């Protein structure tokens, strides 16, 4: 399951993201964070961490360096 999620995220990074304006407020980017979280914690916990991160990525949220726990 983790490999499928990572493939979907990589597809987004390579096929969709280049057409959008850069807008992630964090380092690493939300998609990079998602790949690292899923690789490190598995599909369920890593997916939850990635979803929480994406929910925080808005103009009134934080910004800066935010590593995967």
UniProtKB/Swiss-Prot annotation:
SMART domains: Haemolytic
UniProt topology in membrane: Peripheral membrane protein
Main localisation: membrane
InterPro entries: Membr_insert_effic_factor_YidD
A GO term from the CC aspect: plasma membrane
Record Pfam families: YidD
Residue pairs linked by disulfide bridges in the UniProt entry: none
Keyword Membrane: yes
Residues spanning the membrane: none
Cell compartments where the protein resides: Cell inner membrane
Keywords: Cell inner membrane, Cell membrane, Membrane
NCBIfam families recorded: membrane protein insertion efficiency factor YidD
Role: Could be involved in insertion of integral membrane proteins into the membrane.
Family (UniProt): Belongs to the UPF0161 family.
Name recorded for this polypeptide: Putative membrane protein insertion efficiency factor
The species this protein was found in: Chromobacterium violaceum (strain ATCC 12472 / DSM 30191 / JCM 1249 / CCUG 213 / NBRC 12614 / NCIMB 9131 / NCTC 9757 / MK)
Lineage of origin: Bacteria, Pseudomonadati, Pseudomonadota, Betaproteobacteria, Neisseriales
